[in-house]
From Swiss-Prot:
Principal place of residence: periplasm
Record NCBIfam families: PRK03757.1
Keywords per UniProt: Periplasm, Signal
Alphabetized SMART domains for the sequence: YceI
SUPFAM superfamilies in alphabetical order: YceI-like (SSF101874)
GO CC annotations, alphabetized: periplasmic space
Family named by the database record: Belongs to the UPF0312 family. Type 1 subfamily.
Species: Pseudomonas fluorescens (strain ATCC BAA-477 / NRRL B-23932 / Pf-5)
PANTHER family reported in the protein's UniProt record: PROTEIN YCEI (PTHR34406:SF1)
Residues that span the membrane, as ranges: none
Entry protein name: UPF0312 protein PFL_5802
Amino acid sequence: MLKKTLAALAIGSAVLAAGQVMAADYVIDKEGQHAFVDFKISHLGYSFITGTFKDLDGKFSFDAAKPEDAKIEVNVRTASVFTNHAERDKHITSKDFLDAGKFADAKFVSTSVKPTGKNADGKLTADVAGDLTLHGVTKPVVVKATFLGEGKDPWGGYRAGFEGTTSINRQDFGKMMDLGPASNNVDLYISFEGVKAK
């Protein structure tokens, strides 16, 4: 009787463990530069300026079977802005705009993840809500995110990748130089690849 009880407990424990898939922890691949944040903003309503932030890092936890439990944190160095024009980059990082000398980092921390199904390519999608801190001000934003895939890499690691889009009003994040209402909206695109922590 004791042997049967122990066997039943062992089987039950194995089944329970199999059902409790733990989200894996990942570090965003900064070293390999497999992460970036791009932006697009109207210039006075006459054209568009596009650019990117070249220095960012972060971490996330994710399990494709339970995407609603995912968590992410991304940190961006504001001084790393690049718009292919040195004088403009200098102006963007000045006190007129990002004030990178005072506010060196912009930060996004997720607060919830709401799965929204799959896109036309069959990729998982979700609304990732979180707090964005920029220019010393924290505001809630929602990122439309897509899980691009996961798997082993050639170097013995395991990777997972995502992309996402959102839009913000830059005037919501403290007083910046006024360029008119057409230049307040900023479209953001983020793509990153994480390496599973060992």
